[in-house]
A protein has these predicted regions:
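Carboxylate-rich, polar loop motifs that coordinate divalent cations or form catalytic acidic clusters
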Residues: 1-168
Length: 168
């Protein structure tokens, strides 16, 4: 009798456990060219403090508000435009790095930043939360703040692969 009772209790516990781990159904919606996405190659995603989802594609930066897409085309003609990284700085400033350099979202358009200093692809961005932006690029680490842009080489040979920073 005790064995049967233990068996019944064990069976009930297993049934309750199965019900508890039953897969949840989450609403999922895909976004494609039909919804206004400029390119199907997505390299970077970022959710900002206002709730927008920023999508970095092979040809533009897109802002998704949950319903509509707003495209921010990259104005460089004939160049590889791949968006590699996106970050938000204090004050809701959105920055992105691509194969041509560093960009800032300025209202409804993209503004190239430090084009004379950062002339190579930007692959990673990191903020200290106080207004300093660390930029990992094909040609070293750059530090951007209110004083300007400073370049830091990890290897004195500018062509060295050690200066190619993909992530931080």
């Amino acid at each position: 009798m005790k064995i049967i009772l233990k068996y019944i209790i064990s069976l009930k516990i297993l049934l309750w456990a199965c019900i508890a781990i039953y897969p949840q159904s989450y609403p999922f919606r895909s976004i494609s060219v039909a919804e206004g996405l400029q390119d199907l190659i997505v390299n970077a995603l970022y959710k900002d403090s206002l709730g927008y989802i920023w999508i970095g594609t092979a040809s533009s930066l897109e802002r998704f508000d949950g319903v509509h897409l707003k495209s921010f085309p990259i104005p460089e003609e004939g160049k590889r435009k791949d968006v590699n990284t996106i970050i938000e700085m204090p004050g809701h400033e959105l920055w992105m790095g691509n194969r041509t350099g560093l960009w800032k979202v300025n209202g409804e358009k993209l503004l190239r930043v430090a084009a004379d200093t950062i002339r190579s692809g930007v692959y990673s961005l990191c903020s200290d939360g106080k207004g300093t932006l660390y930029i990992g690029s094909e040609s070293g680490l750059f530090i951007y703040n209110s004083k300007g842009v400073e370049r830091i080489l990890l290897d004195p040979n500018v062509l060295s692969g050690a200066n190619f920073i993909m992530g931080m």
